[in-house]
């Protein structure tokens, strides 16, 4: 039994290193060199094919604009202040109850101050009335960064914070700021005049994407009271000269046009559901995404 064990150990040692044939693990030095050379060339070719494929793919991709945008959803509509559960509840005589809402609006509007838009190399005046979309060339680096339209806070009227630092909350007349989320290259298409006949409050303007805020439910419609809109040219919507958006690389300081909405006589001590909706030929709505083209917010002014 001891001999068998010794013989077995000897065969293993001989397999690892055979001094007679000069073999290591059953192969000579030349054989090991050839097989290693084969695998180096084989995996080198695989790596080359992979890198080449990636390079070819990168040549078809622009860093400024996606090649395919056919599945990009229409832009969402959001409001400031941005709050959890989209509920605004406060007492006009209690500053602490609306302090968070006011601070949220103040912080958002910081970049819209005149002092932040003075650089003429970045910003330009695009008029005080709505006009057509402002094309700024192809989506590439040939012309460098593109200029951005200025947006004046004074256009937001009572909701600008210039005359009322509480944005109406102190008087029980809350303001919300509405913006259309950025989508690269998106150009809004306002609805046709005849499609607005069922919305008498909305006036047709071919250069404005209109927005309307109404009561969400039938019982809310009589409680929402008067609604005032403040925007560029006193238009209740988004002017088209701020579109299309060219992205962070070409327009790092881009300012979205804003629309301010003030509710001046909401029914007190009542939770009112309000829906704000943008109207356009290329604005869509989805039951799965309640912010796509619209949003709803609950507002309660307590006595």
Curated annotation (Swiss-Prot):
Instruction: Tell me the residue ranges located in the Extracellular compartment per UniProt.
Output: 63-303
* Subcellular location per the Swiss-Prot or TrEMBL entry: Cell membrane; Apical cell membrane; Cell membrane, Sarcolemma
Disulfide pairings: 126-149, 159-175, 213-276
The UniProt GO MF terms for this protein read: ATPase activator activity; ATPase binding; P-type sodium:potassium-exchanging transporter activity; protein kinase binding; protein-macromolecule adaptor activity; transporter activator activity
Give the residue range of the signal peptide: none
Q: Phosphotyrosine (modified residue): where?
A: 101
In the record, which positions carry Phosphoserine?
11
Per the record, GO CC terms? Answer: apical plasma membrane; basolateral plasma membrane; intercalated disc; lateral plasma membrane; organelle membrane; sodium:potassium-exchanging ATPase complex; sperm flagellum; T-tubule
**Could you tell me which residues belong to the region immunoglobulin-like?**
191-303
Tell me how the protein is altered or processed after translation: Glutathionylated. N-glycosylated.
Checking InterPro entries in the record gives: Na/K_ATPase_sub_beta, Na/K_ATPase_sub_beta_sf
Q: How does it sit in the membrane?
A: Single-pass type II membrane protein
Q: Which GO terms describe its biological process?
A: ATP metabolic process; cardiac muscle contraction; cell adhesion; innate immune response; intracellular calcium ion homeostasis; intracellular potassium ion homeostasis; intracellular sodium ion homeostasis; membrane repolarization
The stretches that face the Cytoplasmic side, renumbered to this chain, are 1-34
User: What's the chief localization of this chain?
Assistant: membrane
Residue ranges of the TM segments: 35-62
Per the UniProt entry, the glycosylated residues are 158, 193, 265
Q: Which family does it belong to?
A: Belongs to the X(+)/potassium ATPases subunit beta family.
NCBIfam families under this entry?
Na_K_ATPase_bet (TIGR01107)
Function recorded in the entry: This is the non-catalytic component of the active enzyme, which catalyzes the hydrolysis of ATP coupled with the exchange of Na(+) and K(+) ions across the plasma membrane. The beta subunit regulates, through assembly of alpha/beta heterodimers, the number of sodium pumps transported to the plasma membrane. Plays a role in innate immunity by enhancing virus-triggered induction of interferons (IFNs) and interferon stimulated genes (ISGs). Mechanistically, enhances the ubiquitination of TRAF3 and TRAF6 as well as the phosphorylation of TAK1 and TBK1. Involved in cell adhesion and establishing epithelial cell polarity.
User: What does the comment on domains in this protein's record state?
Assistant: The C-terminal lobe folds into an immunoglobulin-like domain and mediates cell adhesion properties.
Describe, as the record does, how this protein assembles with itself and its partners.
Answer: The sodium/potassium-transporting ATPase is composed of a catalytic alpha subunit, an auxiliary non-catalytic beta subunit and an additional regulatory subunit. Interacts with catalytic subunit ATP12A. Interacts with regulatory subunit FXYD1. Interacts with regulatory subunit FXYD3. Interacts with NKAIN1, NKAIN2 and NKAIN4. Interacts with MLC1. Part of a complex containing MLC1, TRPV4, AQP4 and HEPACAM. Interacts with KIRREL3. Interacts with OBSCN (via protein kinase domain 1). Interacts with TRAF3 and TRAF6.
Q: What protein does this entry describe?
A: Sodium/potassium-transporting ATPase subunit beta-1
Which lineage ranks, top first, belong to the organism behind this chain? Answer: Eukaryota, Metazoa, Chordata, Craniata, Vertebrata
Query: What is the name of the gene encoding this protein?
Result: ATP1B1
